[in-house]
Regions:
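Conserved small/polar residues in nucleotide/adenosyl-binding loops
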Residues: 117-124
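A very general structural signal that marks isolated residues within well-ordered alpha-helical segments
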Residues: 32, 124-125
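An N-terminal-biased, well-structured beta-alpha scaffold segment characteristic
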Residues: 2-110
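Rossmann-fold dehydrogenase core element
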Residues: 109-117
Length: 126
């Protein structure tokens, strides 16, 4: 699977959804990873760290969204990102559907597979 990590653009959000170490683990499991240039800077990870982990660094979020089968984010997609979503694409992030009906509708209209971190549990239900 080709996994993409765009830079977070929501106000005051500096985290990144995937560390270089995590990207390296995904690569070792046979996945390809792309990341938007600068996406890790707010968390202390340079583009070089990602490149050394086998990640392809892309110039724009649009490129990341266009190439990736699965998008990993910290925060839910915001208005500027909604046009990038496409049918069958998996988006793995913190979704807040109850608080944002327009986001729910946009995800349904685009046909994405929306997976929210908040709804994942371990086999022990923890």
């Amino acid at each position: 699977m080709l996994i993409g990590v765009p830079k977070e653009i929501k106000a005051d959000e500096y985290r990144v959804a995937l560390t270089p170490a995590g990207a390296e683990m995904l690569s070792e499991d046979g996945h390809n990873v792309v990341i938007e240039s600068g996406a890790g800077l707010g968390s202390g990870f340079t583009d070089d760290f990602y490149a050394e982990a086998g990640v392809k660094v892309l110039d724009t979020a649009e490129e990341v969204w266009a190439q990736a089968e699965m998008i990993m984010k910290v925060k839910e997609p915001i208005h500027q990102e909604l046009p990038y979503m496409r049918d069958g694409q998996v988006i793995f992030t913190y979704f807040h559907f109850a608080a944002d009906k327009s986001l729910t509708r946009a995800c349904m209209k685009a046909g994405v597979v929306a997976v929210s971190y908040t709804h994942l549990t371990l086999p022990t239900k923890a």
